């Protein structure tokens, strides 16, 4: 009689974590950061049909990296939850914190109970009436949730991009300054330096000045005007060239 195969819970959790981290690392990066007028989303995304940045509700936005089908299902679920709560109670009762907690419970249950975890990392952002009330929540594949004070970086080159942001970020940046910083940081990821154009970027904001639905995409000429100049890109690239990481592009049809 053969003994049944046994895997310890610790080993099982390690293997699930490794699977999820590898899937996330294959995705192109996303930067979410606070600026003077609200919250800015900048994603490296050449696709014009598959969005990594989306609206959830009036003052709440969503960004994600990893396996598209999995984080898209989370986005749709979040929209439905927010709509039901806003309809049943009041639109002001729909908050980023409540939605982030719901996502954390869902991701944690999948990680511990299902055979395969979600290969995703997501950010839930909420713009407040003032800059002090803006909120950024980072959620990982296992349901861990962190309230970030300034910015969130997700994806395969997160360490390199975070280093660039840490050296240059300051509170109260204007939109053009924040967008230029985020785009330069994304360009610093990968092997050497790259120049990201309008066709490779997905940019949106939660604009505090808008009265109801604050989410607004920035495309075309408006986005082109936010791109950093050659001189700015060159100076930043020269500083970041020594610690550039690997740019893994395999599986980008499934990993975003």
From Swiss-Prot:
CDD domains: proteasome_protease_HslV. Its main location: cytoplasm. It is found in: Cytoplasm. The formation of the proteasomal ATPase ARC-20S proteasome complex, likely via the docking of the C-termini of ARC into the intersubunit pockets in the alpha-rings, may trigger opening of the gate for substrate entry. Interconversion between the open-gate and close-gate conformations leads to a dynamic regulation of the 20S proteasome proteolysis activity. Pathway: Protein degradation; proteasomal Pup-dependent pathway. Keywords: Cytoplasm, Proteasome. Residues 226-256 are annotated as: Disordered. Residues 245-256 have a biased composition (Basic and acidic residues). This is Proteasome subunit alpha. The gene is prcA.
């Amino acid at each position: 009689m053969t003994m049944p195969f046994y895997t310890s819970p610790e080993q099982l959790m390690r293997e699930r974590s490794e699977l999820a981290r590898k899937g996330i690392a294959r995705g192109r990066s996303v930067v979410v950061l606070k600026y003077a007028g609200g919250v800015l989303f900048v994603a490296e995304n050449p696709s014009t049909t598959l969005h990594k940045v989306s609206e959830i509700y009036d003052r709440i936005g969503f960004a994600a990296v990893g396996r598209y089908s999995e984080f898209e299902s989370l986005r749709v679920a979040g929209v439905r939850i927010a709509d039901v709560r806003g309809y049943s109670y009041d639109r002001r009762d729909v908050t980023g914190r409540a939605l982030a907690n719901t996502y954390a419970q869902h991701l944690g249950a999948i990680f511990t109970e299902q055979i395969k975890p979600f290969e995703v990392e997501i950010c839930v952002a909420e713009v407040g009436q003032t800059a002090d009330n803006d909120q950024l929540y980072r959620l990982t594949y296992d349901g861990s949730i962190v309230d970030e004070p300034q910015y969130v970086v997700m994806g395969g080159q997160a360490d390199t991009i975070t280093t660039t942001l840490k050296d240059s970020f300051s509170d109260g940046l204007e939109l053009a300054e924040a967008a230029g910083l985020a785009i330069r940081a994304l360009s610093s990821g990968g092997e050497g330096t790259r120049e990201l154009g309008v066709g490779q970027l997905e940019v949106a904001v939660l604009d505090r000045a808008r009265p109801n639905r604050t989410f607004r995409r920035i495309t075309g000429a408006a986005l082109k005007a936010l791109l950093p100049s050659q001189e700015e890109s060159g100076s930043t690239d020269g500083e970041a060239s020594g610690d550039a990481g690997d740019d893994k592009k395999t599986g980008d049809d499934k990993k975003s």
